[in-house]
């Protein structure tokens, strides 16, 4: 188990309150495997031809620029953010909306993809999250 996974196992509530198959608790290894499956599925779906711009909406953040300030250089960063900039470039994604980090961002990644989140967060986080209830995104 990597250092980041070990820290997540002991620091993230999900790993002591969410059950997995077989009556076991959810583990970082479970979420890593689920993530790999989801990314493979997303890559395959994005490979299907269609007309128009590509917009992706995910729970987890797709780019290092999404790391919340309190998690910069933290072993917990991989729990909140995974670098999927390769998918952004490969599929020429115009916009990627995400959640999970409880902080908001709006920036253009180096591959031209706009990455945005507008998260309300848990009760009590609205005041400090920067949540914009009237936000409209134009593509």
Question: Where are the regions a protein language model picked out?
Answer:
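Active-site-proximal loop/helix segment associated with metal-binding centers of metalloenzymes
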Residues: 1-55, 60-71
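Hydrophobic "anchor" residues on beta-strands that sit immediately upstream
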Residues: 55, 95-96
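Histidine-centered divalent metal-coordination motifs
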Residues: 59, 100-102
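Binuclear metal-dependent phosphoesterase catalytic core
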Residues: 68, 74-94, 102-139
